[in-house]
From Swiss-Prot:
Protein name according to UniProt: Ribosome biogenesis protein nsa2
Annotated organism of origin: Aspergillus fumigatus (strain ATCC MYA-4609 / CBS 101355 / FGSC A1100 / Af293) (Neosartorya fumigata)
InterPro entries registered for this protein in UniProt: NSA2_fam (IPR039411), Ribosomal_Se8/biogenesis_NSA2 (IPR022309)
Similarity annotation: Belongs to the eukaryotic ribosomal protein eS8 family. Ribosome biogenesis protein NSA2 subfamily.
UniProt feature, compositional bias: Basic residues: 73-87
GO cellular component, one term: nucleolus
Record has rRNA processing as a keyword: yes
Subcellular location: Nucleus, Nucleolus
Keyword Ubl conjugation in annotation: no
Comp. bias regions, Basic and acidic residues: 38-58
């Protein structure tokens, strides 16, 4: 008896899109929970897992190294930005509007008139903003931004050592500096930063912006160097540095009639190139 020939039938799977595939594969947990229910301690386990999250984040932030640390910090940075935005939106939502949509037509008694339009929060917020703007204008400087200076440009390595000269922990400052009259040098063996005598300045050519006069005034100190707090401590004079000068020669007085002795000024030139310190008085 001849064998019967059977034709093969090819069964094809239905073609799924990426979204349908992800939905079908990602909802298996929910499907299983609907069929069989949850553990009795499921909620407690979830609560404890969430409580441990902050500890794990702290541990990762301290212990991750290299590229993983960089990626983790970027992720945390984005999360914090979103959190701040949500908090800010919530705070703005809670602030009562200064202008109500429609004034109430029903008359109010005398003791409730001050509560009809709650503008306290808005008024307080605007007052704080105005104060900040005034403060920013008060401390505005002629040069708000300056070019950065690298440590290689600022410091020159000084090799020391009795015979080998292999020790290189000392640094010589290559920029002009201000050293106060009461400064006492440390013993040479322990002096880390060397400020050459030829680059020390004691006077500055200060211009008064309103009077339009330039006077040579003694420098009292360095208030802030925009490059680095260390440069402020060392008294380095670079472009944009805020210095304190003795303005008693100008005869400036306060509203109460007292003579102004010290005032801040900002260096506007490059002292290492010009050989002199030019500054504008901050009034």
């Amino acid at each position: 008896m001849p064998h019967a020939k059977f034709s093969r039938v090819k069964i094809t799977e239905p073609v799924l899109t990426a979204s349908e595939y992800s939905l079908r594969t990602s909802s298996y947990i929910e499907r299983w929970q609907k069929q069989h229910g949850k553990r009795l301690d499921h909620d407690e386990r979830v609560r404890k897992r969430q409580a441990r999250e902050s500890h794990k984040q702290s541990q990762d932030a301290q212990n991750l190294r290299g590229l993983r640390a960089k990626l983790y910090q970027q992720k945390r940075h984005a999360e914090k930005i979103q959190m701040r935005k949500r908090i800010k939106a919530q705070e703005e939502k809670n602030v009562k509007s200064s202008a109500p949509d429609e004034p109430s037509k029903t008359p109010l008694p005398q003791y409730l008139l001050d509560r009809s339009q709650a503008t306290n929060a808005k008024a307080l917020s605007s007052a704080i903003k105005d104060k900040r703007a005034e403060k920013a204008a008060k401390f505005a400087v002629p040069l708000p931004k300056v070019k950065g200076i690298s440590e290689e440009e600022m410091f020159k390595v000084v090799n020391t050592g009795k015979k080998t000269h292999k020790k290189s922990w000392k640094r010589m400052i290559t920029k002009p500096t201000f050293v106060g009259s009461d400064f006492t040098r440390r013993p040479v063996k322990y002096e880390r930063f060397i400020r050459p005598m030829g680059l020390r300045y004691k006077k500055a050519n200060v211009t008064h912006p309103e009077l339009g006069v330039t006077v040579q005034l003694p420098i009292l100190g360095v208030k802030k160097n925009p490059q680095n707090p260390l440069y402020t401590q060392l008294g380095v004079l670079t472009k944009g540095t805020i210095i304190e000068v003795n303005v008693s020669e100008l005869g400036l007085v306060t509203t109460s009639g007292k003579v102004v002795w010290g005032k801040y000024a900002q260096i506007t030139n490059t002292p290492e190139n010009d050989g002199t310190v030019n500054a504008v008085l901050l009034v």
